[in-house]
Amino acid sequence: MLKINFLTIFPKYFDCFLKESIIGKAIERKKISINVIDFREFSENKHKKVDDSVYGGGQGMLLQVQPIAKALKTLKGLKILVSPQGKLFNQEIAKEIVKNHSEITFVSGRYEGFDERILNYIDIELSIGDYILTGGELPSMVMADSIIRLWEDVIKKESYENESFENNLLDYPQYTRPRVFEGFEVPEILLNGNHKEIEKWRKQKQIEKTKINRPDLYERFKNEK
């Protein structure tokens, strides 16, 4: 079973995530378990305060090391700090995590970030992109979703093997009914029943789309051919 812990001061953010179809079903089938932890409960301040002003001056409030460190000491497995300073998360990292870990903790921040000493209790810092969000809860859920999908028997293996980023290529174009909509038609090759030709067309479209939209992936694809 895969165990995922979310450390946050806003636990209600995760309510919908826990009920989402694939994740909710995986929980019901006992393929995964998810634990949302309010690290305010680990504060030694009588008012359960978890933030304070910045030494040396600066804007805003900083999350204190004490409550987060205390919470992390109760947990096992890989401990991830969700941070804009972190390594950029991608499909390869998701695969490595699934391969090597069965318990994962995401620490979500707020305000102006964390006391730097929190890094002494963390295994890796991860980011989902070069932009700033209000807090770490959304990135935590994004990364957890990606990891959960790869866990054994959560979804069929063939369902994700042909998705974007597998083999360093984006997904191919897909169509459903109606055959014609406002003058836009489904490519004829998809209707002729020739599966070899369809497979060849799809691979070509993957390459074309990747070259245009993600030249970095396209270069990796070329180098691995």
Curated annotation (Swiss-Prot):
The keyword Transferase applies. Its EC number is 2.1.1.228. InterPro entries: Alpha/beta_knot_MTases (IPR029028), tRNA_m1G_MeTrfase_C_sf (IPR023148), tRNA_m1G_MeTrfase_TrmD (IPR002649), tRNA_m1G_MTases_N (IPR029026), tRNA_MeTrfase_TRMD/TRM10 (IPR016009). The keyword Cytoplasm applies. Its main location: cytoplasm. It comes from the Bacteria. GO terms for molecular function: tRNA (guanine(37)-N1)-methyltransferase activity. GO terms for cellular component: cytosol. One of its GO terms (biological process) is tRNA N1-guanine methylation. Keywords: Cytoplasm, Methyltransferase, S-adenosyl-L-methionine, Transferase, tRNA processing. It is an enzyme of class 2 (transferase). Pfam families: tRNA_m1G_MT (PF01746). It is found in: Cytoplasm. NCBIfam families: PRK00026.1, trmD. PANTHER family: TRNA (GUANINE-N(1)-)-METHYLTRANSFERASE. Homodimer. Specifically methylates guanosine-37 in various tRNAs. Belongs to the RNA methyltransferase TrmD family. This is tRNA (guanine-N(1)-)-methyltransferase. The gene is trmD.
